[in-house]
Amino acid sequence: MADLLSSLKNLSHSSGVYQYFDKNRQLLYIGKAKNLKKRIKSYFSIHNNEITPNHRASLRIQMMVKQIAFLETILVENEQDALILENSLIKQLKPKYNILLRDDKTYPYIYMDFSTDFPIPLITRKILKQPGVKYFGPFTSGAKDILDSLYELLPLVQKKNCIKDKKACMFYQIERCKAPCENKITKEEYSKIAKECLEMIENRDKLIKELELKMERLSNNLRFEEALIYRDRIAKIQKIAPFTCMDLAKLYDLDIFAFYGASNKAVLVKMFMRGGKIISSAFEKIHSLNGFDTDEAMKQAIINHYQSHLPLMPEQILLSACSNEALKELQEFISHQYSKKIALSIPKKGDKLALIEIAMKNAQEIFSQEKTSDEDLILEEVRSLFNLECVPYRVEIFDTSHHSNSQCVGGMVVYENNAFQKNSYRRYHLKGSNEYDQMSELLTRRALDFAKEPPPNLWVIDGGRAQLNIALEILKSSGSFVEVIAISKEKRDSKAYRSKGGAKDIIHTPSDTFKLLPSDKRLQWVQKLRDESHRYAINFHRSTKLKNMKQIALLKEKGIGEASVKKLLDYFGSFEAIEKASEQEKNAVLKKRI
């Protein structure tokens, strides 16, 4: 405690970020302050050099303060910089007592550029700095389905560069385009098509009605497979916003955030209203062993959503709850980020309060559906057995694959909300000369990406204690808190025993080794994760090997033998790099003309 007491006596009055650590140097909490000295001292009571938690703090904070042994600070220019740095560090380092919201993606917008002669609908996530652009959104899902439908229902210019080609393409022949490239339609005639496109984007009901008519026509013509495609697309578009029936007399443009939590679970709901109608919505489920802080949740939600410059900002942002201090901070953040005043408020009455109540009702409904399943019970048992600090709600599983140390690849699969999250899977080409170097490269590359993609609760490694130790060293150097276990086959005579029916799995933790019965559900849970990562890595290896064999065959056709191919690969690193290299560069490597 002497180190902590000394740190508390020498605090700066500057703006900055503070980090609390326990006696083992495990990161407990990250916060930010306009005045570091004033903010940090508010956590503690100091009497006769004895440090105790401030009795006015919440029980969650008091419990955390009892564990603090060290603190570190990072000074910045102003409070806005501190707010952004705090959010970035929380995502990267995942402290024990901070809430981590993973959904920080920028939602897509549909736009049309009416400064062009023949405008078409396209998707963007950025602001396009040109006049005449009209945006629609954001869309939390279904933007591509809307776009595909528009191009199939209307004879729009089908590609951005079509006009430059000056020659009608296949789309004209199948009556999906009017061929303005050959002047077969005037700008005035096309503007009517663009106007109808605009109406379908703004009026989802009209779009769905047209899709239903097309589906019926296909069905009547016995084209059932195509009709099924339209049926599925209609269902997706109808799901984009379950609140589209809600229509306010006032043409509000609002973003609405509602947070509801209890015990160790919470839900954040986001709704987006444009022109008085809810056009899309999204929600995120959050888990925490140490309770929730509404201010912290709202701050993360707002910063995650608005830190990238969005094409279409609302007139006002509505929050379900937030302290005055946090509201002021967020207001300053938005004003600074967008150089204009966009009000943040907590409605107390009227139709805006009704919108918050609807968002809260949906958050509570989603929360109530989160019943404890058998899988949740297994997660608790896994935590207890392997002495994990956190329930492994989100898990990343790693495996490598190679053939005689060639075509070395790695795969990462992700398990969350009791299901494999295939959109989060990642594949890696590796350079290591052995399985340990390959695993080290795979895990290092993942750890370097923590700032963009926050770390999980748990890593599962396909390997033994050596691979486990590699993972622990990498995580230690990253500064992020992620727990690790590894699973390997039982070895006999220093070899993995894999004969049918005899392969026993061993689970390694930093402090123990477990040999569980094949019927143990905790072992089966880890095996399920390992098997999926193994399948994913093997499939990637096979596809890489097949692709390489085809590329080797193509080079052989050019008179380049296997030895020369190996030289080129060793030098350039990939077939793609070989193809991009000039003749002079390849000649220099091979010392002969190719």
Swiss-Prot record:
What keywords is this UniProt entry annotated with?
Answer: Cytoplasm, DNA damage, DNA excision, DNA repair, Excision nuclease, SOS response
- Please report which protein family the annotation says this sequence is part of: Belongs to the UvrC family.
CDD domains reported for this sequence = GIY-YIG_UvrC_Cho
Q: How does it assemble?
A: Interacts with UvrB in an incision complex.
A molecular function annotated in GO for this UniProt entry is: excinuclease ABC activity
Q: Which gene encodes it?
A: uvrC
Q: Where is the GIY-YIG domain?
A: 13-99
Q: Which HAMAP family match?
A: UvrC
Report domain UVR positions. Answer: 205-240
* Primary role: The UvrABC repair system catalyzes the recognition and processing of DNA lesions. UvrC both incises the 5' and 3' sides of the lesion. The N-terminal half is responsible for the 3' incision and the C-terminal half is responsible for the 5' incision.
In its UniProt entry, the species of origin is given as Helicobacter pylori (strain HPAG1)
Segments forming a coiled coil: none
Q: List the GO cellular component terms.
A: cytoplasm; excinuclease repair complex
- Gene3D superfamilies xref list: 5' to 3' exonuclease, C-terminal subdomain, GIY-YIG endonuclease, UVR domain, UvrC, RNAse H endonuclease domain
Quote the protein name from its UniProt record: UvrABC system protein C
UniProt record, GO biological process? nucleotide-excision repair; SOS response
Chief location category: cytoplasm
Q: Domain of life here?
A: Bacteria
Please give the PROSITE patterns that the UniProt record associates with this protein. GIY_YIG (PS50164), UVR (PS50151), UVRC (PS50165)
Entries under InterPro entries matching the protein: GIY-YIG_endonuc, GIY-YIG_endonuc_sf, GIY-YIG_UvrC_Cho, RuvA_2-like, UVR_dom, UVR_dom_sf, UvrABC_protein_C, UvrC
* Family matches, as PANTHER family: UVRABC SYSTEM PROTEIN C, UVRC/OXIDOREDUCTASE
Where does the protein end up? Cytoplasm
Checking NCBIfam families in the record gives: uvrC
